[in-house]
Amino acid sequence: MRDEAIRILRHMGFALADGPEIEDEFHCFDALNTPEDHPARNEKDTFYFDSGKLLRTHTSTVQIRSMEKQTPPVRVISPGSAYRRDEIDATHLSAFNQLEGLYVDTDVSVGDLKGTLEYFLRALFGSDTEVRFRPHFFPFTEPSFEIDVKLKVDGQEPRWVEIAGCGMVDPNVFEAVDRELGLEPGVQARYTGLTGFAFGIGLDRLAMIRWGIRDIRALIENDMRFLAQFQ
């Protein structure tokens, strides 16, 4: 699933980017416009080390690091592991796999965002796949959307299934990156004033939907009877 998603997005012009799994609060939260009182920053939700470092809760951290290293335009995807203090059950793991993407340039629009993700999801699930965008909230994007696709699940009639989150990058994110680079937004800015979109997809959830896997724990239990189906 991971390789197929990467192949499609690379064909669309996205470059692979990577970053550390042990992160700091700036790259995981502050730069992503996440306020100090946000529940995601609580020790009940995030794995913190005594040093103050943490296990990244999403691969959006790589988007910030990519902007720090590159000059616009930026078009990257960052597949990798993320970690949260979730109670492990049929749909949740404390360590899971994500794929996130970022595109930043001049005059990037919501239409670009929707067109990109519709193309990607139809390449993944079939050209006739129905896709819809629902308004949502994320701290680091505005406007924000959740994406549903209409699929047959467990042999039942087609129904809407939540598949990803996305949105237009909040201007506060660009300003945070510029300040970290020592650039004054609006004066020497590298990113302030540009536009862009970001998206995030759970690869484990994609695999569960694609192959009708009912329990996410099957992906990590190394049961050969299960794994043999995918050779």
Please state what every model-predicted region is.
Residues 1-231:
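TRNA-recognition modules of translation machinery and tRNA-sensing kinases, especially anticodon-binding
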